[in-house]
Every structure is written in C-alpha cells, then in structure tokens.
Amino acid sequence: MKFFTALAAVGALLAPALALPTPASEEASHNQTLSVRLVPAGHTMVRAIVTNNGERPLHLLSFNTILDEDPTSKVEVFHESGDEAEFLGMLPRYDLSDLTEDLFTRLAPKDSVEHLFDIATVHDLKWDGKYTLAARGAIPVAEDGGTTIIDHVYYESNELDMEIDARKAAMVPRAFDDYFSKSLDKRRPLDICNPRKERDLRAALEGAQQVAKEAAAAAQNNTEKVFEFFRARDPGTRKEVSQHLSSISRAATKDGSSVTWFCSDGPGRCGPRTIAYTFPAKNEVHPCPLFWQMPHVNNKCHRQDRVGTVIHEGAHNPSVVTPYCKDLGYGYNRATGLTSQRAKRNADNYALFAMARQLVFCLLHLFVALPFIYIFASF
C-alpha cells in the first residue's frame, strides 16, 4: 500500500480541519417523519400510502424507492415457508447529478401520496399460500423548491400478509416476459456494439477488474477504510468485503464471465436518468446512453463514472455475490449511513469503497490548487 510521504504529512496537518461528521446510522435516524402503509388492493396488487408526518414540506426523489415508476424492487416478499420470492425486475443505477424539478414529488405536511403496484409483475409467486410483504428504505430529499439532495428520510412499513393463488399470479403479465422468453443466444445478436462502444466497454471492464482487485487486497488490511464504508472492523467483515470485491473483479470481463455484459438496451428500459441496469434473475447488465457519456474515471469526489458503474452493477448479480446486492442507498452520505449488515448488501458501498483510492485527491483539492497533478493514492 503506497502513500506519498509529502501527502501524508499534509494530510496529517489538515486532518483536524477536514474532520467530517460521522454519518448517522439509519436506526438512529428513524424519526417517523415519513410513514409508509401497505394495504391490499386485490390479489397481487398493493397500495402504498406515503404520509409526511412532519411540520415541513418534503421534496422527495423517487429513484429506487417505494415511489419508483420503473419495474424495480419496492417491497421484500417472503412466502410462509421462509423463502424469498425471486425478483424478476430490474436494478437500475440512476444519474444523480443535475437533477430536475420533474423528478421530485412534493409532499406537504400531513399530506399523503399513494402508489399502486402489482408484485406479480416483478416477483415469481410460484407457491400458493401466505406471503408477507414489507418495505424499508430511505428517500432522498431536496430543499423545498430545489433539486440538490440535502438529506434522506427513512421509512419502514407495516408487514402486509396476502393470500396468493400461484396459478392466478402466473396469469399477470410480467414486466420482462417478452424479453426473457428469448434465449440468451437469440438476445445476443440484437446487441449491437460499434467499435467505439466495444472499446469503451472493454476499457471500463478492465479498469473495474483492476480497481476491484486492488480494493479486495486493501479490505484485508485497512480496518478504518472498511469501517468508513461498511461500519464494522472485525476480520469477518473485512474478509467478506474482500471476497465480494474479488468476485466482482473476476466477473469484469466480456470473455468467460458469469455475467453477460451487453452493449445496448435490448429490453428498452433506459430512462433519461438511467446509467445502466441489471437483471439479477439473468445475470445480465445493460448500459444506457448515459453510460457512454460518462468519463472512464471521474476525478471528482464520489462521482459516478463507467468504472464505478461496472463495479456497482457487478455486485447486483447473484453469480458474483450471493445474496446479490440491492440498492439500499445511493451516494457516499447515504451508503455510509447504512448499518453494517445493510452496507454489505448495498451495491454502491462496494463501488464507493473501490473508487475511494482517489480520496486523498478529493480532500486536498479543496485547499490546494493542483491543476497539473492527478493523484491516485492507494489505501
């Protein structure tokens, strides 16, 4: 592990000034500002009633939350046997920069908004009997009338029990039935990859392979860095994080990977803010137009780029990480505020941890102008 002596000295001098508040854990942040109530709405239909219990308006961003309009995971679904229903939807990574007003929902104090969805469209309800549903997460919040994320409000719903007839549930059209009905061999010819995209994708995979490999080694030794991103210092956590990053590194290749890395949006699910998305049920990753517009590596602190996106999406695949990682929190502040168990299940924690070798540069550029130096500091 390398450090530049001069940088270490400067870092020591600046440490008191740069001390950042430790993000509050999500348990400590539950203040009932936002409540979510799940109610049955007909066989496999669910109505989520989201209420602002606070005294101020909430400006809520819906990405990867109970309010998301995409066929994403909104609730956890468990059969009475204890088995979790397989998720058949998409896990998208959204662009969180330059957000616009239309992406937010304004919720005045004591007001509610309802969101209706059918769990059968994205879950395999193959068993008859009782299913238990619950939603838990955090919704990014901007200032009222603004679009800059300043905080998150946490929610934890009631548990909803539903009696489901598997035969009837199977009659509900699933979100990606048309696409999944084709074999992988038939889907691949539709994946048009021009020379530039082929080059950029391979470069992103190779970059992610190297970065994840280095991060896996760092996780075994850098206790404080592991604590920063995964909220635990014990050897078991360091080993688990290291193993997951090693698996992501091995999967980051177009040749012989357990993940199919596509060049195009075959299913047609790229929205204007979607960078890429994964089908965990198929171990497939699809990039969106935004992916190609991003830098290979972003030289700004904790910002999104192609290499980090490959690591993030790699963590979503069950052939790489078991159980696969979900989207429980986006961005540095939210990801580092998760509990240890949830941080280890969150894709962004692995991407942020792996890309954090740029952290020294991120801190120093606040105080020192270094226009001609691009610093990469290993953990």
Swiss-Prot record:
Record-linked InterPro entries: Fungal_M35_metalloproteases, MetalloPept_cat_dom_sf, Peptidase_M35
Organism for this UniProt entry: Trichophyton verrucosum (strain HKI 0517)
Named cofactor requirement(s): Zn(2+)
GO cellular component terms attached to this protein's record: extracellular region
Propeptide, residue positions: 20-187
Carbohydrate-modified residues: N221
Function statement: Secreted metalloproteinase that allows assimilation of proteinaceous substrates. Shows high activities on basic nuclear substrates such as histone and protamine. May be involved in virulence.
Primary localisation category: secreted
KW Acyltransferase (keyword) present: no
Name the record gives this protein: Neutral protease 2 homolog TRV_03208
N-terminal signal peptide: 1-19
Binding site for Zn(2+): H312, H316, D327
Coiled coil: none
Subcellular location(s) of the protein: Secreted
Gene3D superfamilies linked: 2.60.40.2970, Collagenase (Catalytic Domain)
Active-site residues, Swiss-Prot/TrEMBL: E313
Gene Ontology MF: a single term: metalloendopeptidase activity
Catalytic activity annotation: Preferential cleavage of bonds with hydrophobic residues in P1'. Also 3-Asn-|-Gln-4 and 8-Gly-|-Ser-9 bonds in insulin B chain
Keywords: Cleavage on pair of basic residues, Disulfide bond, Glycoprotein, Hydrolase, Metal-binding, Metalloprotease, Protease, Secreted, Signal, Virulence, Zinc, Zymogen
Family matches, as SUPFAM superfamilies: Metalloproteases ('zincins'), catalytic domain (SSF55486)
Similarity section: Belongs to the peptidase M35 family.
